Amino acid sequence: MEDDGQSSVAETLDPALQKKHHDMLERLSARHQARKSDSPDSSSSSSSTLESTSSFLAKFSDSKRSIESRIAESRLASSSTDSSKLKSDLAEISVAIDNLEKLLAENSYFLPSYEVRSSLKIVSDLKQSLDILSGELVPKKKFSFKSKSTTKKPESKLPEIQKPDVVLPPKLVPVRDSPGLRNKHGETLVKSFEGSSIGEFTLSDLDSCQVKLTGTVNALFLHRLKKCSVYTGPVIGSILIDDVEDCVLVLASHQIRIHCARKSDFYLRVRSRPIIEDSNGVRFAPYCLDYKGIDEDLKTAGLEEETNNWANVDDFRWLRAVQSPNWSLLPEEERVSLLTISGDS
């Protein structure tokens, strides 16, 4: 997912994070172009996907081993390490785990589903190992006079250690300076990207609005939307969504990541499996938008084929074998069959 929760945070964001986010989008766009150029030869495309999967697994495994090693080293060095240094080490490990989860999210669109689930389990296990370590080490130094506090204090300490995991997902912060529609209430907002060179576009702080976007754009960011209906043409790269409630969103993209969504319906066409985090009451159905020129826009974005991935949702906060209770398929009798919009009204 990727925006901040407060305006003041956006103004003080480390420029390095902005560059990292931009580079991520460039990589996604480059991957898309590579897939398009390879598509005429199915065998070549299959080989490329296999190569990409192998490359990801190698990088993921290296990072996993590094994190496991750092956890083990921190445990061994705890007796000779001062409290402030220990906290710093644990925080760095937490950031490394978050970066590993981000790596998985960025590459999930071409990975086999079993690799995604296996990798999610690994990330979850690493987080649990860090939680246990922080519970064993940090409370001992601060609360050594309570011998039984070791098993109870991790919960009070976890928010500090896990802070990157809470703060980092809303990374829409870097795009606050990008073109967009912001701070509107009860309006119909229309924008056409036809003939435009806009790379990124943001919808932020909208309440009870209807938004119609036609044409293609490289990346789309949605942040703090309430009681809105959003209809968009295809997005070449990714769509990152944070903090939406009581909304209907009709979206097409290669990757869609949803963070903190509540009681909202998503009509999607997406090349990879949609990802939800910290969300509940969200329902999914197939993309149903129509406007003049949409077929050409879908081809331009490499989204002309329906993959049915709209129904294959990954809940990053639900790793059990049973269906996540946080999302469901929108019943057919409740779905909108077709929505027709225009770029000028």
UniProtKB/Swiss-Prot annotation:
Name the lineage: Eukaryota, Viridiplantae, Streptophyta, Embryophyta, Tracheophyta
Q: Which cysteines are joined by disulfide bonds?
A: none
According to UniProt, the tissues expressing it are described as: Ubiquitously expressed (at protein level). Present in leaves, roots, flowers, and stems.
> What happens biologically when this protein's gene is inactivated, per the record?
Disturbed microtubule organization. Lethal embryos that consist of one or a few grossly enlarged cells that lack microtubules but not actin filaments. Failure to localize KNOLLE in mitotic cells. Cortical microtubules-free interphase cells and mitotic nuclei missing spindles. Reduced trichome size with fewer branches.
Q: Protein name, please? A: Tubulin-folding cofactor C
Source domain of life is Eukaryota
DNA-binding is among the record's keywords: no
Please name the GO terms that the record assigns under molecular function.
tubulin binding
Give the Polar residues compositional bias ranges: 1-10
* Family classification: Belongs to the TBCC family.
Which BP terms does GO give this entry?
microtubule cytoskeleton organization; post-chaperonin tubulin folding pathway; tubulin complex assembly
GO CC terms of this entry: cytoplasm
Q: State where the protein is found.
A: Cytoplasm
Q: Which residues form the signal peptide?
A: none
> Which key words tag this protein in UniProt?
Acetylation, Chaperone, Cytoplasm
Q: Which SMART domains match?
A: CARP
SUBUNIT field: Supercomplex made of cofactors A to E. Cofactors A and D function by capturing and stabilizing tubulin in a quasi-native conformation. Cofactor E binds to the cofactor D-tubulin complex; interaction with cofactor C then causes the release of tubulin polypeptides that are committed to the native state.
Q: Which residues form a coiled coil?
A: none
| Pfam families named among the record's database cross-references | TBCC, TBCC_N
